[in-house]
UniProtKB/Swiss-Prot annotation:
The gene is rpmH. This is Large ribosomal subunit protein bL34. It comes from Vibrio cholerae serotype O1 (strain ATCC 39315 / El Tor Inaba N16961). Pfam families: Ribosomal_L34. The keyword Metal-binding does not apply. It comes from the Bacteria. Keywords: Ribonucleoprotein, Ribosomal protein.
Amino acid sequence: MSKRTFQPSVLKRKRTHGFRARMATANGRKVLNARRAKGRKRLSK
């Protein structure tokens, strides 16, 4: 049997998918702008 791949951790989630992580790189800012343009309610986790 294989283990479950989703092992939740708030810290890991924020560091990889959080708003400040997105703002830190040019591509991350692209992601945020794309989500703004699409009209997403939540921009990041």
